[in-house]
Amino acid sequence: MQKFHVYGQSRLNGEVNISGAKNAALPILFAAILAEEPVKLTNVPELKDIDTTLKILQQLGVVTYRDEQGAVHLDASNINHFVAPYELVKTMRASIWALAPLVSRFKQGQVSLPGGCSIGARPVDLHISGLERLGAKIVLEDGYVKAFVDGQLIGKRIVIEKVSVGATLSIMIAATLAKGITVIENAAREPEITDTAVFLNKMGAKISGAGSDIITIEGVERLGGCEHSIVPDRIETGTFLVAAAISGGRIICKNTKASTLDAVIDKLRDAGAKIEVTENTITLDMQGNRPKAVNIRTEPYPGFPTDMQAQFTLLNMVAEGSSKITETIFENRFMHIPELIRMGGKAEIEGNTAFCHGVEYLSGAEVMATDLRASISLVLAGCIATGETIVDRIYHIDRGYEHIEKKLRGLGAKIERFTEKIVD
């Protein structure tokens, strides 16, 4: 099993190139199932979840390859299989996005009930109910979600019960080939949804309102090919900004969009960071200072993102003062806190709220990653702690951060990946 060995007390300084957003690349890759002509995607990150998605698409009959420049090419013109199998789906909850384009274009699709990270309940109910509203017949059988439609999906007005990025994407993707007009109300507003809509429109879809809470889709008969560049990863950007903030450093994030990170940037400024933005860069300078504690409440976009909660929990554990962190999106998303406490952090958990009390320094320890964002907070903690830190189960990190140790080393971190030999 691979682990990270992190040597502490590094001040992180320098420049880092931000990768394409995994949370946009995944739905866009699945949406390419709709295309009757070849698609070319650039700025697609090299991640375990991307590799899994490409394997699922290949299983369905999509021809895929990466060229020498890193662009991903997809040809879904000869799809001949309509089942996303358990052995691939079990590692990634986003696999449910395969269902909508399959049933929309081919009138049938089966996806194994997905696995993925261990952040509480992430039910597929909203995906299913949305497809049913469009006319799909869905059964749960033998561990699979099986969807069929007689004739064609029919556009409807759909009010999503609880704001959901996944369900918004599923309904929007399915509705592109539905008959008539679909209106999604209480839609999620994340930039990754907007990027997916831009991609679909390039293929010939007629989508308006993405980025607002009402999205309108006028169904079309077919979708063609296109070229598209994935938007920058705002969560990776935020993660590196926090890395500089907790270490007293200065960082320039390049190839990113500050406009998608307003809530995070506001909190970093509250914590004492000096931040300057241009069209595609963000510069953060802590000028050697320790951050100030900031209260956090996670909310759907454009509120503070749940995917930045673990990183700010770490920031608050080494900040001046005490803070309150409220997690409103997912249950069971404080699993990093006991590990940070093992490193000398001080915090109490009460339901969906954590109370953090800043300490001057953390101490290196052996810690275990539990999910993607929790795991990166442990790596960053190791970068600033005294002594050495071993981070176990780093496969979580490989799901969402491209070349993470290379990027951190470029900023001055002392980090090595190693494989622990298992002795019988």
UniProtKB/Swiss-Prot annotation:
GO terms for molecular function: UDP-N-acetylglucosamine 1-carboxyvinyltransferase activity. Pathway: Cell wall biogenesis; peptidoglycan biosynthesis. Its EC number is 2.5.1.7. HAMAP family: MurA (MF_00111). GO terms for biological process: cell division; cell wall organization; peptidoglycan biosynthetic process; regulation of cell shape; UDP-N-acetylgalactosamine biosynthetic process. The keyword Glycoprotein does not apply. Its main location: cytoplasm. Cell wall formation. Adds enolpyruvyl to UDP-N-acetylglucosamine. The modification 2-(S-cysteinyl)pyruvic acid O-phosphothioketal is found at residue 117. The gene is murA. Keywords: Cell cycle, Cell division, Cell shape, Cell wall biogenesis/degradation, Cytoplasm, Peptidoglycan synthesis, Pyruvate, Transferase. This is UDP-N-acetylglucosamine 1-carboxyvinyltransferase. The active site is at residue 117. Gene3D superfamilies: Enolpyruvate transferase domain. UDP-N-acetyl-alpha-D-glucosamine binds at residues 93, 122-126, 162-165, 307, 329. InterPro entries: Enolpyruvate_Tfrase_dom (IPR001986), Enolpyruvate_Tfrase_sf (IPR036968), MurA_subfamily (IPR050068), RNA3'P_cycl/enolpyr_Trfase_a/b (IPR013792), UDP_GlcNAc_COvinyl_MurA (IPR005750). It catalyses: phosphoenolpyruvate + UDP-N-acetyl-alpha-D-glucosamine = UDP-N-acetyl-3-O-(1-carboxyvinyl)-alpha-D-glucosamine + phosphate. It is found in: Cytoplasm. It is an enzyme of class 2 (transferase). Phosphoenolpyruvate binds at residues 22-23. Belongs to the EPSP synthase family. MurA subfamily. GO terms for cellular component: cytoplasm.
